[in-house]
Amino acid sequence: MAMNNILGLFAHSPLKPLQKHSEKVTECSDLLIPFFQTTFSKNWEQAEEKRLEISQCEREADSLKREIRLKLPRGLFLPIDRTDLLELVTQQDKLANYAKDIAGRMIGRQFGIPEEMQEEFLHYVKRSLDAIHQAHRVIEEMDKLLETGFKGRELKLVNDMIQELDSIEDDTDQMQIKLRKMLYTIESRYNPIDVMFLYKIIEWVGVLADQAQRVGSRIELMLARS
């Protein structure tokens, strides 16, 4: 995005660039669904195309992050500290990085999720992405929160949304346990290194939900300080 466009967003609302970045990060993460679907069919050429899409999207998110860091005006009349806003951008940018890393590691190993685990695994990925979408919804709601001076019913709504984000992350924890148990019952069929790789993939997908929760926690901390 051009520098003057970023400045224009800041002029309209100091939170708009943050929301734009969150939107891009969410877009990157969502690309994991078609990526994993191509790995299920062992179509590694098509999976590589999807990985490149994720990588390009991550670069765009990174560019937005850098522009925000460089152009976030000082002396904003906000009940939020500038440093807190920059830290929030850093935390949500990690989501795009993790999506890129997951796809890259899958392509590097070219070893897919066992067929009997694929349906449950895809549910798990989608639930982890639900956490990212919930974090994005909280970011989108912050404009209204700004209008109310970070208080009242809007503050309660945002806090409730963050609690829902925590609940989604709890769901992914339980789904991760279930997937590990499924893998344990079939791991004797596979090379031990491949088995360890599968356990790591399950863990990495869970990190997406964990990181989305960290974004929510960062917002919660910002609100407590405001």
From Swiss-Prot:
It comes from Haemophilus influenzae (strain ATCC 51907 / DSM 11121 / KW20 / Rd). Transmembrane segments: none annotated. InterPro entries: DUF47 (IPR002727), PhoU-like_sf (IPR038078), Put_Phosphate_transp_reg (IPR018445). This is UPF0111 protein HI_1603. NCBIfam families: TIGR00153 family protein. Belongs to the UPF0111 family.
